[in-house]
């Protein structure tokens, strides 16, 4: 191999509106204490009515491109992961975002892997770059999860927030600046654990109608148990495969879904507090955006430097899951 895929830059963006736990008390049987005790979340950000996922994503993307010392015209491929796309079926949010960046006549597509979206993005970008097909790949996790939440459902609406994270994946000849390894997986037999239903309308050829509300639904207890079990095994596998131990990792950056899930994995693998990056308390679960947002916060706080090894993991609807070992290669 002449070169490896490398994470050259990272950036993030969140809406300005902060929504604290206590605000849910106005319309739900809940409290600040109840939410924080069960999730670790204190507040989250919600986009306004005019903002879409692509609007959040494009701000992060512009900064990621600038931090990689590139222009939008240097980007060869744009891939977006989202569970809250701008449009129901088409065009893809990646196409919309590309246009907002001024990128024309370059491929762009979406990935649907829910909260595991960023790990899937890394896998795709690594494959394209290391095959030699593309040199600079822009990957974006962009979510307006508030657009798919049922604010009558206490089990879901308190968990999520809006935001975006973006990275440029380019080339390097140095292994210790590379996207070292990515593993992704899925099991559709559990698709009914976490899903967003689609409303069916009758047609002249089919009288069936399902008046299901198009909001995110989740079997919380089942998802929690499967997430902990699956992530523990997945993280152990990728470390063993690469002959690494937890102490070899500079930062452990898990998907920011729930503090209890993160804590269970952290304690089992004996990661030290200073190794773990946590943002769930102030952003909630931002789905495909949560890992790049957490990475960006670590970078901007001075905790992540060039050459540092990160361990990433995520679990989401599908069910999907994955993990990655990534050396920070840029900025």
From Swiss-Prot:
Coiled coil spans: none
State a single Gene Ontology molecular function: beta-ketoacyl-acyl-carrier-protein synthase III activity
Q: Any keyword RNA-binding?
A: no
Which reaction(s) does the protein catalyse, per the Swiss-Prot or TrEMBL entry? malonyl-[ACP] + acetyl-CoA + H(+) = 3-oxobutanoyl-[ACP] + CO2 + CoA
Segments of this protein annotated with the region ACP-binding: 256-260
| Active site: residue positions | 115, 255, 285
Its subunit composition reads:
Homodimer.
- Per its UniProt record, what HAMAP family does this chain match? FabH
Protein name in the entry: Beta-ketoacyl-[acyl-carrier-protein] synthase III
Taxonomic source organism: Helicobacter pylori (strain J99 / ATCC 700824) (Campylobacter pylori J99)
